[in-house]
Curated annotation (Swiss-Prot):
<dbReference type="InterPro" id="IPR004788">
    <property type="entry name" value="Ribose5P_isomerase_type_A"/>
</dbReference>
<keyword id="KW-0413">Isomerase</keyword>
<feature type="binding site">
    <location>
        <position position="123"/>
    </location>
    <ligand>
        <name>substrate</name>
    </ligand>
</feature>
<comment type="subunit">
    <text>Homodimer.</text>
</comment>
<feature type="binding site">
    <location>
        <begin position="28"/>
        <end position="31"/>
    </location>
    <ligand>
        <name>substrate</name>
    </ligand>
</feature>
<comment type="pathway">
    <text>Carbohydrate degradation; pentose phosphate pathway; D-ribose 5-phosphate from D-ribulose 5-phosphate (non-oxidative stage): step 1/1.</text>
</comment>
<dbReference type="InterPro" id="IPR020672">
    <property type="entry name" value="Ribose5P_isomerase_typA_subgr"/>
</dbReference>
<dbReference type="InterPro" id="IPR050262">
    <property type="entry name" value="Ribose-5P_isomerase"/>
</dbReference>
<comment type="function">
    <text>Catalyzes the reversible conversion of ribose-5-phosphate to ribulose 5-phosphate.</text>
</comment>
<dbReference type="GO" id="GO:0004751">
    <property type="term" value="F:ribose-5-phosphate isomerase activity"/>
</dbReference>
<feature type="active site" description="Proton acceptor">
    <location>
        <position position="105"/>
    </location>
</feature>
<dbReference type="GO" id="GO:0009052">
    <property type="term" value="P:pentose-phosphate shunt, non-oxidative branch"/>
</dbReference>
<feature type="binding site">
    <location>
        <begin position="83"/>
        <end position="86"/>
    </location>
    <ligand>
        <name>substrate</name>
    </ligand>
</feature>
<feature type="binding site">
    <location>
        <begin position="96"/>
        <end position="99"/>
    </location>
    <ligand>
        <name>substrate</name>
    </ligand>
</feature>
<comment type="similarity">
    <text>Belongs to the ribose 5-phosphate isomerase family.</text>
</comment>
<dbReference type="Pfam" id="PF06026">
    <property type="entry name" value="Rib_5-P_isom_A"/>
</dbReference>
<protein>
    <recommendedName>
        <fullName>Ribose-5-phosphate isomerase A</fullName>
        <ecNumber>5.3.1.6</ecNumber>
    </recommendedName>
</protein>
Length: 232
């Protein structure tokens, strides 16, 4: 079974949690896209839901699939967000933002009663940090912001290279919010909750890819089957 099959299986399991009338956060990335496609099939079969997309790419996918969309300005809370992740640890702390949508993903997940993370089992780790940690930054004063980010890493005993994410034609990658992303190649993040707090205090940092205490459930699809882990 290839990875896309596993991602789709995880997405299908999460879909079992969706009921008519729900307001849903729609994640970004290849695994979340499977969920959007499967949800679209249900919607075409009569399921009545409304979604808030976490990126322009997901907005386009959802529209193509016939899913009704709204915004967080028009509705209050969401019942459920289903999204992928780049890494998940045993405390259900996440690294997200490989696809560059971390800011909207975090806003949407935080506005949801539940967040289900869907992933293939390769995303499950003992310690976060092998996947480069995305940090969304304001272009103004980038060098100063980078220094502050590096200081935060030192404070938690982490170290590694910070690389500005490349976009098209030699330009920096630009997020849906018009910001840049620096990816931190740390290898290991010893204290993710503390690092999350420190990064949030840096003025030039818009958001970071550490999702702490946000995911309620992780659905992991592997060759042995599907495993569901709930946050303690
Ligand atoms: O955080 C994300 C996008 O910003 C994605 O959820 C994350 O990168 C996982 O993507 P994929 O399902 O393609 O592995």
């Amino acid at each position: 079974m290839d990875k896309e099959d596993l991602k789709r299986q995880a997405a299908a399991r999460a879909l079992e949690e969706v009921r008519s009338g729900m307001k849903l956060g729609l994640g970004t990335g290849s695994t979340a896209r499977h969920f959007v496609e499967l949800l679209g099939e249900k919607v075409r079969g009569g399921l009545d839901v409304i979604g808030v997309p976490t990126s322009e790419v997901t907005r386009a996918d959802a529209e193509r699939c016939g899913i009704r969309l709204t915004t967080l300005d028009e509705i209050d809370r969401l019942d459920l967000t289903v999204d992928g992740a780049d890494e998940v640890d045993t405390r259900l702390e996440l690294i997200k933002g490989g696809g560059g949508a971390l800011l909207r993903e975090k806003i949407v997940a935080a506005a949801s009663d539940r967040m289900i993370v869907i992933a293939d089992e390769s995303k499950w780790v003992d310690c976060l940090g092998k996947f480069p940690l995305p940090v969304e930054v304001i272009p103004f004063g980038l060098a100063a912001t980078r220094r502050a980010i590096e200081k935060a890493f030192t404070q938690v005993g982490a170290a590694g290279q910070l690389k500005l994410r490349d976009g098209e034609a030699g330009h920096a990658f630009v997020t849906d919010g018009g910001h840049w992303i620096v990816d931190a190649h740390l290898g290991r993040i010893p204290d993710a909750p503390r690092l999350a707090k420190l990064l949030s205090e840096i003025p030039g940092v818009v958001e970071h890819g550490l999702f702490i205490g946000i995911a309620s459930t992780v659905v992991l699809a592997g060759t042995e089957g599907i495993r569901t882990v709930e946050r303690a």
